[in-house]
């Protein structure tokens, strides 16, 4: 009887450890995916900002070229 209790306890501990490992792996994978997604979103936002800056700079240059001829 005592041996059976040890086996049951050992199996429960093993299952708990396996569950913990699986949960940790899933969490790690999810966190990595979230991080990659966040970095991709930030890169896309930075790219849009650069494009806006580029357009604004082109508009400024265009106005600078037009201003002297208008005077």
UniProtKB/Swiss-Prot annotation:
Q: What is its main location?
A: cytoplasm
Q: What is this protein called?
A: Stathmin-1-B
Q: Which cysteines are joined by disulfide bonds?
A: none
Q: Tell me, in a sentence or two, what this protein's role is.
A: Involved in the regulation of the microtubule (MT) filament system by destabilizing microtubules. It prevents assembly and promotes disassembly of microtubules.
Question: Keywords on this record?
Answer: Coiled coil, Cytoplasm, Cytoskeleton, Microtubule, Phosphoprotein
What Gene Ontology terms describe where this protein resides (cellular component)?
cytoplasm; microtubule; neuron projection
Q: Where in the cell is it found?
A: Cytoplasm, Cytoskeleton
